[in-house]
């Protein structure tokens, strides 16, 4: 999670943190579809639903904590940016469970959906940006921030910053 201010030409990173949206105490929560694929279908549906509900609760808690931290520093939180994957529609659960590549796709989609849902629960508008729409120029524009804020300055943080600035521009 990256909180940003400013613009792409004058960006500022206010906060960055890893948030946990898969409960390590809940078996299978990190890869719920992989876990479900090993179960009879009736149990698989329940397993995926439990992981989803748990992840939603964790995401709301993480977003609320971030918002509170930013507000305590005098910042107004006006929205949430979310990086999207390929956007290909998923089939029904039985087809997902029968295809190993779809297990990965479904898990990525589930966690993005969880974050989007949680942001809306926290009354934050969500700006979704497909990864393929991120330009090399926009990523290059924020590359130098890494020196100012220190390591780590990973690709996922760079992507999150560009998407956060896009959400801010639309707020």
Please state what every model-predicted region is:
Residues 2-171:
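Phosphate- and other anionic-substrate recognition elements at nucleic-acid/protein interfaces
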């Amino acid at each position: 999670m990256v909180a940003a201010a400013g613009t792409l030409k004058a960006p500022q990173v206010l906060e960055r943190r890893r948030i946990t949206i898969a409960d390590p105490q809940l078996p299978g929560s990190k890869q719920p579809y992989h876990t479900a694929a090993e179960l009879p279908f009736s149990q698989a549906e329940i397993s995926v639903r439990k992981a989803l509900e748990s992840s939603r609760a964790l995401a709301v808690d993480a977003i609320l904590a971030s918002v509170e931290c930013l507000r305590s520093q005098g910042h107004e939180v006006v929205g949430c940016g979310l990086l999207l994957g390929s956007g290909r529609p998923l089939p029904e659960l039985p087809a997902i469970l029968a295809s190993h590549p779809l297990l990965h796709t479904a898990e990525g989609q589930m966690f993005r959906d969880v974050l989007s849902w949680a942001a809306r629960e926290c009354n934050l508008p969500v700006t979704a940006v497909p990864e393929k729409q991120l330009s090399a120029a926009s990523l290059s524009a924020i590359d130098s921030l890494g020196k100012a804020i220190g390591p780590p300055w990973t690709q996922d943080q760079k992507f999150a910053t560009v998407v956060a600035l896009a959400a801010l521009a639309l707020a």
